[in-house]
């Protein structure tokens, strides 16, 4: 199962999700039809102190569950998930590019995925010093961006932040 889903995005007919784990173990998942993602048996998070049962199984596969593509321990409180803008896709040279916001880590996270979209091959974080909640989308679900590639992110402090990516290749 899933514990606390936060964001969903589709790339090339594949569905990706972010979810909060318990005291760590936040996940990026590739959703597979009829797949079981382990909750409440398997998690990379830690049980809360008021629960007397043993810790979670760390390995999802040993129990027939699907492993996350990526997990964060300690927790970053991952939130929204969107496909990268065309400018970022061109810059990184791949369709498999996702943006996620984080509340606790207060950063924008860029996930780079393999060509098959079945594993994370790179991750970048940009710190904002604010709890980031949502990335603006168009009515059709595409990530909203201005002609220069900038995006807009809302924070829990009530701010709307315009993010411009200075995409200069070495």
Q: For each predicted feature, which ranges?
A:
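Structural signature of WD-repeat beta-propellers
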Residues: 103, 155-156
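Short beta-strand-to-coil "C-cap" segments at the C-terminal boundary of structured domains/repeats
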Residues: 161-169
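Conserved beta-strand positions that form and line the central face of beta-propeller blades
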Residues: 125
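Surface loops and adjacent helix of pleckstrin homology
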Residues: 20, 156, 165
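A generic structural signal for well-ordered alpha-helical surface patches
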Residues: 106, 130-133, 158
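Beta-propeller domain segments
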Residues: 1-121, 140-150, 168-170
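Short coil-to-beta transitions that initiate beta-strands within beta-rich domains
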Residues: 77-78, 128-134
